[in-house]
Amino acid sequence: MSEVDTIAKQNITRMNKLQKRLRHEVGSAIADYNMIEDGDRVMCCLSGGKDSYTMLDILLTLQQRAPIKFEIVAVNLDQKQPGFPEHVLPAYLDKLGVAYHILEKDTYSIVKEKIPEGKTTCSLCSRLRRGTLYGFAQHIGATKIALGHHRDDIIETMFLNMFYAGKQKAMPPKLLSDDGANMVIRPLAYCREKDIEEYSTLKSFPIIPCNLCGSQENLKRGAVKDMLQMWDKQHPGRIETIFTAMQNTSPSQGVDRENFDFISLKRNPDAVNTGDVADADLPAFDFVDISNNGHINLDISNRIDVVATFKP
């Protein structure tokens, strides 16, 4: 076997392994959030980037194996960016045999007119694109709108909102539009960007660069991405832990008055004292006991003595 054949075989093996992992992660996300139901018509939004290509590819694979029946319709919005290769997506989708629609709307000119040179165009561009896609979804009777955001996007968005907007807010895997007319799903919510990138390369998807924002440096998101990548290298498993933490919130242990009713929280005068101590709260306090060099021993075995000797 030649070196070329060996490399090709290794690539196929790696691609199959990645597809299995991505298929499992997408399937888990769909099941966990009930993203796709029997009889759904899923409008798969295809931009021509690695994420949306991977999403379509994995959804088509799952469609063949799923115990339920659902339809997939690919939709691309041609925003009339200069140099956009209009033939690429139709040729790719024709080869796949997937039903698709190519929409044309000159949002590029609107964005260039409204946004000063050098400023980030992403916000306005995505808002215009979202409005068009939401409307078209209703036009074709789509019951779900699938977007290609992955786990890294979700985590980055959370930190962006924390650092720059003062909010604990990310991208939900499943979202009902404000008017209640459209249901948005993110099947790649459990998938890592580096897996998607490698899979896209191995599959040789015909990537279409975004001339409007693909080469535009979004400094804030870029800084957050760099931070997360550094953590991933220096502290393996930290990104996974962050995402797990996002799925395990406890409003009563936070400070958000909108998510938990602290105002009407009262002690029960009739409650029987069981000696229960809020373990999570103990490290936050600095109890003083002059008989123990200024500090009380909070070890569980000494907790009764601690309560007995503590004199505020």
Swiss-Prot record:
Name of the protein: tRNA-cytidine(32) 2-sulfurtransferase
Principal subcellular localization: cytoplasm
Cofactor(s) this protein cannot do without: Mg(2+); [4Fe-4S] cluster
Keyword line: 4Fe-4S, ATP-binding, Cytoplasm, Iron, Iron-sulfur, Magnesium, Metal-binding, Nucleotide-binding, RNA-binding, Transferase, tRNA processing, tRNA-binding
Record's cofactor remark: Binds 1 [4Fe-4S] cluster per subunit. The cluster is chelated by three Cys residues, the fourth Fe has a free coordination site that may bind a sulfur atom transferred from the persulfide of IscS.
Source organism per UniProt: Shewanella frigidimarina (strain NCIMB 400)
Segments carrying motif PP-loop motif: 47-52
Name of the gene this protein is made from: ttcA
Positions that bind [4Fe-4S] cluster: 122, 125, 213
Keyword Nucleotide-binding on entry: yes
NCBIfam families the record matches: PRK10696.1
Quaternary structure and partners: Homodimer.
Top-rank EC class of the record's enzyme: transferase
GO biological process, one term: tRNA thio-modification
GO molecular function, one term: 4 iron, 4 sulfur cluster binding
Family statement drawn from the similarity comment of this UniProt entry: Belongs to the TtcA family.
Subcellular location: Cytoplasm
CDD domains: TtcA-like
Function: Catalyzes the ATP-dependent 2-thiolation of cytidine in position 32 of tRNA, to form 2-thiocytidine (s(2)C32). The sulfur atoms are provided by the cysteine/cysteine desulfurase (IscS) system.
